[in-house]
Structures are given as C-alpha cells and as structure tokens.
C-alpha cells in the first residue's frame, strides 16, 4: 500500500515544541512505516521521517516570517496532487483546502478533521462528502451535517512519557495561552487551593497573556515557562499533582490530557467537548463544571491511582491502536 501523508506546514513534522497536528501526523506516519506501509510524507523540507520525505516548502511559516502561509499552503497542495496517481490513498492532515483538489484526481482521500471550528467551514466539507472520507478525532466533534467514515482518537508513544509515581504538590497548566484553554481559570483554582502553578504553552493571544498571566506570574506561586518539547515536556507533565484543563470551548481532543495521564498525572478538566471521552471521572481525573468544583477536585487528587492513569492511556490512547484503526480504515476504503 502506497500512502501520501499530507502534513500541515505551520510547524515542522514532528514539531520541535508546539504543533499538535504535526505531532499526530508524525506519530501516525512512523507507526505505519513500522507496519510496512510505503508512506511518503509531504511536509516542510526540514521535517523528519523514516518514510520518504517529499515537499517544496522550505520552512514552517510559524517559524519563518518570510514564508507566506497562503502562498506556500497552495504550493504544497499542488505539489502533492500533481503526483496523486502514484499513490493508493491520500491522507490529508492539513485541513479543508485539500478538498478543492479531491475531485480532480482519482486517488481516494481521507481527511482527519482536527477540530470542527464552526459551521462557516461547512461549504468546504459538505460538497466533497462523496470524494473524501472524513475522520473525527472524537465523537463530541462530529458535526451532524457530515458523514464520517470513523471516529479515531489520537494516540501517543507512551514510552516517550516516563511514569512518575509521586508527582509533586504543584499544579500544572499545559496549552495555548488563549481564553479557550483556561489559563485564567487555572490560576484562580491554584490560588484558591494555595498551591503553586506552572504554566507551559505558546502565547496565542497577547492581550490575554498580558491581562491574565503577566500580573499573576510571580515565579513563586505562578510561573510561566513558555513552550517546551521532547524530554522537557514529559518531565513537566509528570512532575505535578494534577493537570488543570479548565477549557472554555468544546475541545475536539486534548493531547496534553493523555500525555499527562501517561506520566501518571491526573487531569482535572471541564466537563465539555471531548473531555468525557478521555477522562473517566474518579479513575484518571475529575470532570468539573466550575472553578469551585476544580478546587474541590484538587483536594481529592490523592484518591487517584497514578498507575491507573498511565494504564488508561496504554489501553485506549496508544499510537499502535491509532495506527491499527487507520490501517483498517484504509483497507476498507480500498477494498483490501
């Protein structure tokens, strides 16, 4: 089976620090290659893969301001689709622009919808349902107006996240610094529980960062560390009493949630979006509806078995399970 894996070009694949879509694309690509699938990864030219790397984009546009996102996204797409007939299947991880090319080629295409942002994007999904096989990353993120080939939860390489059986007394926030992700709520919950909070993530909303994070960050009770990747990411996720994920939107998935649990860290999350699909209340974390409930949950974290947190990820959110699910979908589409 020859698969063209179309990665986004906002960040390198795999990302150096931040880049959840690129991370999932890389994890799936490498797992498929390990299973003997002939995968060509179409990504930025600084990307890395055990498969075949192909591309025309010199660098990620979020890292290099000289790269015009719109120009190079379409150049990226054109480069792949010009050679579509070389492949049995195209797997699009790069959002809806690729759909404009789908009707122009005979090669079947899978699109992983990494988050259905609003009804405004439906015009780039509904007309292509007979040509593109859509995959949701959670049942919560399925849109009622679309047909889906499957729901496939993300998976991670659990061995990349060392188990910490103890953690610490401190709390953790891990995500974009943006109102959606609830940094302000995490700060409020940490203060109310009188525990230190460590925040990690890229600043996506500068005004919000200046209003909510900067005044609170005294490097004693609240510390902002910026974005981290690799071993530093795993170390941060494991060395906490709990991850506070008090989101203000219906998040389609949450990689940091399952990464934290893989390290043994329980997650206290808002009971919305995909969180009830990831968190089993009282087993690997707690689902809450307010900051007050989060504060109460912080005091109950001792009831959670950190080994059970890791086991829940091993059973449900491994990269092997994700790769097997996608491979089964590919075979079903191709009639193999």
Predicted regions and their residues:
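Catalytic cores of nucleotide-sugar-dependent glycosyltransferases that transfer UDP/GDP/TDP-activated
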Residues: 1-336
């Amino acid at each position: 089976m020859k698969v063209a894996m179309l990665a986004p070009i906002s960040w390198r694949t795999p990302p150096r620090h931040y880049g959840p879509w690129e991370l999932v694309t890389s994890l799936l690509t490498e797992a498929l290659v390990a299973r003997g699938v002939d995968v060509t990864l179409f990504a930025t030219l600084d990307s890395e893969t055990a498969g075949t790397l192909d591309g025309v984009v010199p660098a990620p546009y979020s890292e290099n301001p000289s790269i015009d996102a719109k120009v190079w996204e379409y150049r990226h797409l054109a480069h792949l689709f010009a050679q579509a007939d070389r492949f049995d299947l195209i797997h699009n991880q790069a959002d809806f622009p690729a759909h404009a090319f789908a009707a122009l080629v005979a090669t079947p295409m899978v699109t992983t919808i990494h988050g259905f942002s609003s009804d405004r994007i439906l015009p780039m999904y509904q007309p292509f349902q007979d040509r593109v096989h859509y995959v949701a990353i959670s049942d919560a993120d399925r849109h009622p107006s679309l047909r889906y080939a499957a729901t496939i939860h993300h998976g991670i390489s659990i061995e990349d996240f060392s188990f910490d059986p103890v953690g610490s007394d401190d709390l953790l926030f891990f995500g974009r610094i943006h109102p959606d992700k609830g940094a302000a709520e995490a700060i409020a919950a940490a203060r109310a529980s009188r525990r230190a909070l460590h925040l990690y993530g890229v600043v996506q909303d500068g005004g919000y960062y200046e209003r909510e994070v900067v005044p609170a960050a005294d490097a004693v009770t609240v510390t902002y560390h910026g974005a981290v990747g690799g071993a530093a990411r795993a170390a941060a996720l494991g060395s906490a009493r709990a991850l506070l994920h008090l989101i203000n939107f219906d998040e389609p998935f949450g990689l940091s949630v399952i990464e934290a649990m893989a390290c043994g860290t329980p997650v206290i999350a808002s009971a919305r979006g995909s969180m009830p699909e990831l968190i089993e209340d009282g087993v690997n974390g707690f689902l809450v509806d307010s900051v007050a409930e989060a504060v109460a949950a912080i005091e109950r974290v001792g009831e959670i078995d950190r080994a059970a947190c890791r086991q829940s990820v091993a059973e449900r959110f491994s990269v092997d399970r994700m790769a097997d699910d996608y491979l089964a979908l590919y075979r079903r589409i191709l009639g193999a």
